[in-house]
Amino acid sequence: MKKGGGRNKGFPQDDESSISLRQLMVNEGLIPSLEDEVKRRGVINQLRKIVVRWVKNVAWQHRLPQNQIDATNATILPYGSYGLGVYGSESDIDALCIGPFFASIAEDFFISLRDMLKSRREVSELHCVKDAKVPLIRFKFDGILVDLPYAQLRVLSIPNNVDVLNPFFLRDIDETSWKILSGVRANKCILQLVPSLELFQSLLRCVKLWAKRRGVYGNLNGFLGGVHMAILAAFVCGYQPNATLSSLLANFFYTFAHWQWPTPVVLLEDTYPSTGAPPGLMPIQLPCGSHQYCNSTITRSTFYKIVAEFLLGHNLTKDYLKLNFSWKDLFELYPYANTYTWFTKIHLSAANQEDLSDWVGWVKSRFRCLLIKIEEVYGICDPNPTEYVETYTKQPNIVFYWGLQLRTINVSDIESVKIDFLKNVNSGSFRGTVGRIQLTLVKASQLPKNGECGSNNRSKKVTKTCWRIREDKQCNNVPVYSKHLPGYVVGYQKMVNREADGMEVKC
């Protein structure tokens, strides 16, 4: 990362503009309270105690010598928005459980640790996601949502603050653990590289709010995710180590409005020389590994939308030193209803709210395929990430409205899009109760009055791509016995009845 730039010391307006921007952050609720921080820190500390007890119990089950049982250890490392210090009051916690070589993910993590967590009074809504790219346990601890993946290192004991950048701990680990560790390693690299942690955190809070308001935030919809935004913010901070917050935010939009994509954004230049063309339309290199890039779902449509918003952001912030400048325009909600004539309406429903959460999470994990198909049929599509609820419908539902750029549309073409998408949804291994999908085309004039961005009808909590292991009549509790202590039950696993399989979604 090159260092350069400087603070505009000759302009008192710069300080005034930064004060105004910080006040906006407070007004928007971007700064969590001290109580929020204490509560989250308490959750992490409790989880660390739990996994230490868990791993010692696992060591005993594996019949390790007493001295090794006493010495072994596991730990919890927070990452994501909480690890970077940019979480909000509604944010969840991404926390990685790191265990030693003998603690397996299949038996010890997903069964033994899951049952230990489930027995805790602070834990509720515990789900397991085994088939995802990042297998994890998801639950609420004292009301705070926690995503807990697992990585296994080839050592007996994990230091409490293990250095995940140290090659000693990374030797001979499996591919799943390597992928999971990449997020934690990226966090640590970013925090080491930025010249001012406080300014980086403030800048990242601002650009994430901007991305959400302008509809360009969310990996599942083909936009920028949290790690993308963090690297872009760190990149700008590295070029202006002495800048004010307002100068950094204006320079953020100047930099990426003029960026020559697909030139990759690289924090550590020349550290890992590239041997081939970087992947994707907007390649952003992870700062912690050779030739590793952020996972990207950006398509032709979303690329154009992101670039357009960078340009608009630059036009809105280039005069930030002028008298009476206001930051509010930068964070205006995107005017979907005034921009597009036609919309693809995606209506998802289920029998109850819990089933709906699982169903929406599964369907959203297939959204990129739907977006590409719509692009083939209709051209440019703007997949608004906002989740709406049709309050006049009794059945629990979530609705999406994706803008289409064409002025005239062949309505019958939606049938081919629908058939193709249903095949994709049915081709996976969804473990929950199958819901319902309806794909239709509607005009902007047909949008519900409260269906526009910024309405009170917006769902506050975005549904995650997670589906639970069902705990209903379609499942049986099957005891799982230790491989090392015959007759010793380590926990119970949910097994889906065969007759419940083979269900397909229909419109």
Swiss-Prot record:
Mg(2+) 2 binds at residues 92, 94, 147. Pfam families: PAP_central, PAP_NTPase. It is an enzyme of class 2 (transferase). It comes from the Eukaryota. It catalyses: RNA(n) + ATP = RNA(n)-3'-adenine ribonucleotide + diphosphate. Its EC number is 2.7.7.19. One of its GO terms (molecular function) is metal ion binding. Expressed in leaves (mostly in petioles and tips), cotyledon, roots (tips, vascular tissue of the radicle, and throughout the root tissue excluding the elongation zone), stems, and flowers (restricted to the stigma and the pollen in mature anthers). Active in the primary and secondary root systems. GO terms for biological process: mRNA processing; RNA 3'-end processing. Disruption phenotype: Lethal. Essential protein. Polymerase that creates the 3'-poly(A) tail of mRNA's. Also required for the endoribonucleolytic cleavage reaction at some polyadenylation sites. May acquire specificity through interaction with a cleavage and polyadenylation specificity factor (CPSF) at its C-terminus. This is Nuclear poly(A) polymerase 3. The gene is PAPS3.
